[in-house]
Each structure stands twice: as structure tokens, then as C-alpha cells.
Amino acid sequence: MAETTSLAFPNMFNLTSNQVAVSEDIASVVERTRLLILTEPTELYNNPDFGVGLKRHMWKYNSTNERALIKDRIIEQLRLHERAVFPDRTQFTDGLLSSSDVPGEIEDPNSIKMTAVLQTTFGKEISLTLNQDAPVEGTLTINSSGWTVTQNL
């Protein structure tokens, strides 16, 4: 039996079996977290409390204040809407976990690179990487159990 289930996102309908598609366990948590992070407030369900709202940070410089605002907003949204994650155990790193830091590399003030590691209630970890290289373009990469989901912002 699955620990948690939800409607599959973004493909909510399984056309071959003429049913609503359902995700289970880690895929369910990944899809719900992805939906939560990529949604702007009032964009879905017309709820002002649902969604991290990353677009408001797109034209701002990569300062410690901006990173702190994004981190706080992600934790706040997980606390409100994601029951399968321990929000207080979320760990953030500035930069990408998979790349090594090159000494002397100048940080670009127009890019945000942040990785969050979430602990689920059933003992798995999810790694979320926000990589916004330019003010116009950005991607959210979600790594979990060997597969990666990338979404353009």
C-alpha cells in the first residue's frame, strides 16, 4: 500500500485506460512539491496562500536577502500544504550540489542557484535545484531516485 497518493501532475488523465492518473509515494511528493514551487499565489485554486511565487524574484539581484526570502517562502508553503515532508528539516545550499565550487569564481549577481533537500515522512530524500541563470530564463530541476524533472520558469 502506498504511503501517499495524489493526482498526477501535469498529466492528470490516463487516456489509455480512460481514468484519472494517480501518483504514489515519492513520485506523488515530487509532483506536489513541484506544483507548489512553480505556482504563483492565486494562480491555482484562486488561493492567495498556495504557491511559492518565484516570478516576483526574477528581476532582482542575487543577494542574501533574496535567497533568504525564497528559502522562507518554500518552507512556509511546505508547512502549509505538504503533509508528507518535514519542512523544518529542509536543508538549503547556495549553489548546485552536483557541481564543485571553483575557487576564485565570481558570483553572478543576476543568477540564483539554490538546492533544497527535503526529508519525507516515509524516509526518502528529495533534492530540489533552482537554477535561474538569467533574469528572463530559469529552470527548476527536481532530482529524486535517479530521475530528474526540469521545468522552465
Task: Enumerate the predicted regions with their spans.
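Acidic-histidine catalytic/liganding microenvironments
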Residues: 81-82
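Immediate N-terminus of the mature polypeptide
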Residues: 1-76, 87-153
